[in-house]
UniProtKB/Swiss-Prot annotation:
One of its GO terms (biological process) is nervous system development. Residues 50-64 have a biased composition (Low complexity). Self-associates (via CH domain). Interacts (via CH domain) with ced-10 (GTP-bound active form); the interaction facilitates the localization of ced-10 to the cell cortex. Residues 121-247 form the Calponin-homology (CH) domain. It is a peripheral membrane protein. Its main location: cytoplasm. Residues 1-18, 87-104 have a biased composition (Basic and acidic residues). Pfam families: CH. It is found in: Cytoplasm, Cell cortex; Cell membrane; Cytoplasm; Cell projection, Growth cone. The keyword Iron does not apply. This is Calponin homology domain-containing protein. Involved in the actin cytoskeleton assembly in dendrites of the PVD neurons via a ced-10-independent pathway. Involved in assembly of microtubule cytoskeleton, intracellular organelle transport and neuropeptide secretion in the high-ordered dendritic branches of PVD neurons. Required for the proprioceptive function of the PVD neurons. Promotes the formation of cellular protrusions. Facilitates the localization of ced-10 protein to the cell cortex by stabilizing its active GTP-bound form in the BDU and PLM neurons. Does not associate directly with G- and F-actin.
Length: 338
C-alpha cells in the first residue's frame, strides 16, 4: 500500500508546474580588449610572416632572370666610389702634368718605357750592332742582325743572344781571358747543346756581376732560355750599361747614346708624318670614289641621246663610212691627280 502511495506522489510532482525563478540570470561581462590585442597581432604576424617570405622568394625568383640579363649573370652590389660625382669631375678638370723625359744614360729602362715600339726596335738593333763589332772583329764571321730597316723586335733581340756564344766573346773582347767559352761536341744532341748555352750565359752573367758591381748576376740562363720576352729587360739593361761604360772601364769604344736617341726620335717624327699623310690619302680616295658614279651616269645619258637620234632618223646613212667608236674609261684617282 505504501509503494502505491509513493508512485502516486512521484507522478503528482512530475505534473506540477515549474517554480518561477525569483532571481535574475547572471550577465556575461566581456573581457577588456586591450589585453588580448597584442596576442592577436602576434598571431597574425606569425601567420603572415611565412606568407610574406614566400612572396619575397617568388618575387626574387621572378626578378632573377631580368637581373641576369642586365648584369650578364653576375650580381653586383653597389658601393659608393669617391670617383663619382664631384670628385670625378674635379679629377677630370685637373690637367695632368706630362712626365719628364728620362735620361737613357741614368735610367735606360724608364727611357725605353717612354718610347713607342718602333723606337725601341731601333735601339735594339744599335745595341746588337755594337756587341757584334766589339766581340767579333772579322766582319765575315758576324751573324746577320735580325729585323727589317735596322729595327729588331724584343723576341728577335732575345733570340740573337740565346746561344751565349756572342756574350762570352764580348766579355773576352772587353777583358781578355775573362770567360772560358764552352763549345759543344760535333753531332751533339739538343740537351748537350743547351747545357753548353747555359754555361756560356752563366759565365757571362758572373763576369757582368763583378764588372758592374751588382748584388746578383744581372743576366741568367733563364732570362734567355726560359722567360722569353720577359727576360728582355735584364739582357738589354746589362748590355746597355756595358756599352755606356766600355770607354771608362775597358778603354774600348762604346756606342753613342746621343745617336741612338736621335734615331728613336726620328722614328717618332716619321711615324707621325706617315699618320698624317695616310689620313689625307684616305680622304682623297673617298672623294674619288664618290665622283666615279657621276661620270658613269653622264656616259649613260650620252648613250641614251645617241639612241634617240638614231630612232628619229636625224643621223644620215653611214653604211659606207667607217664608224669611230670613242671609249671613255675612268682613270684612277691617283692618275687623275697627277
Amino acid at each position: 500500500m505504501s509503494e502505491e502511495i509513493k508512485k502516486i506522489e512521484e507522478v503528482a510532482e512530475q505534473d506540477k508546474a515549474p517554480k518561477v525563478p525569483t532571481t535574475e540570470p547572471p550577465v556575461d561581462v566581456p573581457a577588456p580588449v586591450t589585453e588580448e590585442a597584442p596576442k592577436v597581432e602576434e598571431a597574425v604576424a606569425e601567420i603572415a610572416a611565412p606568407a610574406a617570405a614566400e612572396g619575397e622568394t617568388a618575387t626574387a625568383a621572378a626578378a632573377a632572370p631580368e637581373e641576369k640579363k642586365k648584369s650578364g649573370g653576375v650580381a653586383r652590389r653597389f658601393t659608393f666610389n669617391k670617383r663619382w660625382g664631384k670628385h670625378r669631375d674635379a679629377e677630370a678638370s685637373t690637367p695632368k702634368e706630362p712626365e719628364a723625359p728620362k735620361d737613357p744614360k741614368e735610367d735606360v729602362l724608364g727611357w725605353i718605357a717612354q718610347q713607342i715600339p718602333q723606337a725601341v726596335h731601333k735601339a735594339n738593333y744599335q745595341v746588337i750592332d755594337w756587341v757584334q763589332k766589339t766581340a767579333i772583329p772579322e766582319e765575315g764571321e758576324r751573324k746577320t742582325i735580325p729585323g727589317k730597316d735596322q729595327a729588331t723586335t724584343r723576341n728577335q733581340f732575345i733570340g740573337f743572344f740565346k746561344d751565349g756564344d756572342v756574350l762570352a766573346k764580348l766579355a773576352n773582347a772587353l777583358e781578355p781571358g775573362a770567360v772560358e767559352v764552352a763549345a759543344a761536341e760535333e753531332n751533339a744532341d739538343a740537351a748537350a747543346q743547351k747545357e753548353v748555352q747555359k754555361k756560356n750565359i752563366d759565365a757571362f752573367g758572373a763576369w757582368a756581376q763583378k764588372t758592374l758591381g751588382t748584388e746578383a748576376a744581372p743576366v741568367t740562363n733563364e732570362d734567355l732560355l726560359e722567360k722569353g720576352k720577359a727576360g728582355y729587360t735584364a739582357v738589354f739593361q746589362t748590355l746597355w750599361q756595358l756599352g755606356v761604360q766600355a770607354k771608362e772601364k775597358f778603354d774600348k769604344e762604346g756606342f753613342n747614346v746621343d745617336t741612338i736617341v736621335q734615331l728613336a726620335n726620328s722614328v717618332v717624327k716619321s711615324g707621325l708624318l706617315t699618320t698624317i699623310l695616310g689620313f689625307f690619302r684616305r680622304n682623297r680616295q673617298a672623294a674619288a670614289a664618290v665622283e666615279e658614279p657621276k661620270d658613269e651616269t653622264a656616259a649613260a645619258e650620252g648613250a641614251g641621246e645617241a639612241k634617240e637620234e638614231g630612232a628619229t632618223g636625224e643621223v644620215a646613212d653611214t653604211a659606207d663610212e667607217p664608224v669611230a667608236v670613242k671609249q671613255e674609261t675612268s682613270a684612277p684617282a691617283a692618275v687623275a691627280a697627277n
